[in-house]
């Protein structure tokens, strides 16, 4: 085969260049190697096959190129009317498909080495024309410009697609798709570990989320006719627009109102101030975050579901054990905070019969009423003065009480094995009863009697 090392002296893909290898209409070039400063020009009606372009060499294409390999800064420029079939883009290789150009069956192995959607436009595949049946592997990236369109793209883990134009029939097998302002994605299939992100001004239609796939719709983004199958994750807020079906039936997030949303396996719904959510199902791995001034009613918390809220929100529903709970009007009743959950009690508000199972309970003042229970892994953080006139119970396992002060005529009861650590806290209670386990004080003051039973440790 021929080796070409001239033709780029006046810049990449410049019409001012006159050197290099020219393949004219009816001509064919086979097994050519294009190296540094080299250029192969395939004119309309010409064909190049099995070309290797490396070390900064380039191929300018108005005709047909088949099975081109781009290595180490090798570049391929597909002009209007040109077609590239079966191109392989290896590390630091670069393919540009200009308006009217077509690339089919491209394999992209470069462009995303800097991480997901990093600012890297010097390698990978850039689509201003049309790209069909592209495979994007680990470290591969396809960028679809506003004038570009991609069809039937397959993206594996570690690869990604950035959409400013149109993307149709994309399949995410662990890969990522980012749809930007003005971009459109249709018929995207999100399988395990795949991730589709619809940014502000971006749109998606007919996305399907399968087990452990994730659709994220940012504020100002829109996704319509979504199919969320069991185990698929939806991440969004009430500032986005999302419609579709899930295992409960039809769901929607429109104009600040969410209805019938299912959250699991990394799914999350943020209910913003002044917005509402109804009939939300929060299962294992799902998170419902209700901001101060937001409202969520008929919430169903499953095992492993996470609730984030403060006493300025309005939330009501049932816990994983079937017990009704409520937050509203400065009062929280019967909350159960599982691992990852968090509730903040604001000054002047009251929390009654709160159970913390590995979650975080923060009291910025306010009052603890009824029985407050800390189970294994629970954290109660005090800020300022919090009043407890009833019972704070620490059961089996380890728990942490930290910061601020706990005052009032209530009691602290430690039962079951494990350690209650009190750190940087002032305890002023009627009594501290150490029935089982260990009480550890770190930079804390206890201004009450501590009654320690035999076999306990202080």
Label each PLM-derived region with a short phrase.
Residues 1-458:
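Beta-strand-rich extracellular passenger or scaffold domains
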């Amino acid at each position: 085969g021929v080796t070409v090392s001239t033709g780029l002296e006046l810049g990449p893909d410049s019409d001012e260049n006159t050197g290099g290898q020219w393949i004219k209409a009816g001509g064919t070039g086979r097994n050519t190697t294009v190296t540094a400063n080299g250029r192969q020009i395939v004119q309309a009606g010409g064909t190049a096959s099995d070309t290797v372009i490396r070390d900064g060499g380039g191929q300018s294409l108005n005709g047909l190129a088949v099975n081109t390999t781009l290595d180490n800064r090798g570049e391929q420029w597909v002009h209007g009317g040109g077609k590239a079939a079966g191109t392989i883009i290896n590390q630091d290789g670069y393919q540009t498909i200009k308006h009217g150009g077509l690339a089919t069956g491209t394999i992209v192995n470069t462009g995303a080495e800097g991480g997901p959607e990093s600012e890297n436009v010097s390698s990978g595949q850039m689509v201003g024309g049309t790209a069909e049946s592209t495979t994007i592997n680990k470290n591969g990236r396809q960028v679809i410009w506003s004038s570009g369109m991609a069809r039937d793209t397959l993206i594996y883990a570690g690869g990604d697609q950035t959409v400013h134009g149109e993307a149709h029939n994309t399949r995410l097998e662990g890969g990522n798709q980012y749809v930007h302002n003005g971009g459109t994605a249709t018929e995207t299939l999100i399988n395990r570990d795949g991730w589709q992100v619809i940014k502000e001004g971006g749109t998606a239609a007919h996305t399907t989320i399968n087990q452990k796939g994730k659709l994220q719709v940012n504020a100002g983004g829109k996704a319509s006719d979504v199919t969320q199958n069991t185990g698929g994750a939806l991440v969004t807020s009430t500032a986005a627009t999302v419609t579709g079906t899930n295992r409960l039936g039809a769901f929607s997030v429109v104009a600040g109102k969410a209805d019938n949303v299912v959250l699991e396996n990394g799914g999350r719904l943020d209910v913003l101030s002044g917005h509402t959510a109804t009939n939300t199902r929060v299962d294992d791995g799902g998170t419902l975050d209700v901001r101060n001034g937001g409202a969520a009613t008929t919430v169903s918390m499953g095992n492993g579901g996470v609730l984030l809220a403060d006493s300025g929100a309005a939330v009501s529903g049932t816990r994983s054990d079937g017990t009704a709970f409520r937050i509203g009007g400065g009062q929280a009743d019967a909350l159960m905070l599982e691992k990852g959950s968090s509730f903040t009690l604001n000054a002047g508000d009251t929390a009654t019969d709160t159970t913390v199972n590995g979650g975080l309970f923060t009291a910025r003042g306010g009052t603890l009423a009824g029985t407050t229970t800390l189970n294994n892994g629970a954290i109660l953080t005090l800020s300022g003065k919090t009043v407890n006139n009833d019972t704070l119970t620490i059961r089996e396992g380890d728990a942490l009480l930290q910061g601020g002060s706990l005052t009032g005529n209530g009691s602290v009861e430690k039962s079951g094995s494990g350690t209650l650590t009190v750190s940087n806290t002032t305890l002023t209670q009627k009594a501290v009863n150490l029935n089982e386990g260990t009480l550890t004080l770190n930079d804390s003051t206890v201004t009450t009697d501590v009654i320690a039973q035999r076999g306990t440790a202080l």
